[in-house]
Amino acid sequence: MDNWVFLFSFLTVALLVNVPAIFGKCIDQNNAEHDVGESWQGDGCSKYTCFVTEDGDYYYATTRCPKYRVPPGCHLESKPGEYPNCCPRAICPEE
């Protein structure tokens, strides 16, 4: 069971969002400018990365913590900090 939890603890969820751009920079939801390739911390436990496609469209990729199906007898614990250190981890009793 511990191997199953370990395997899935490294999977993340990414979402692409088309964003406005000005002077070759992504503009985030707080109107802050970010260079292409730059990553920044998002609200909660997430990370954003700015990139541009070959067509000149600007996007940021949102990377979030995985969702778990916690085995019986286990629970999730989160730690403060930046992504990915703040992601919840499955804690299971030793067998």
From Swiss-Prot:
Keywords: Disulfide bond, Secreted, Signal, Toxin. Contains 4 disulfide bonds. It is found in: Secreted. It comes from the Eukaryota. Belongs to the scoloptoxin-16 family. Expressed by the venom gland. One of its GO terms (cellular component) is extracellular region. InterPro entries: SVWC_dom (IPR029277). It holds the Pfam family SVWC. The keyword tRNA processing does not apply. Its main location: secreted. Residues 1-24 form the signal peptide. One of its GO terms (molecular function) is toxin activity. This is U-scoloptoxin(16)-Er13a.
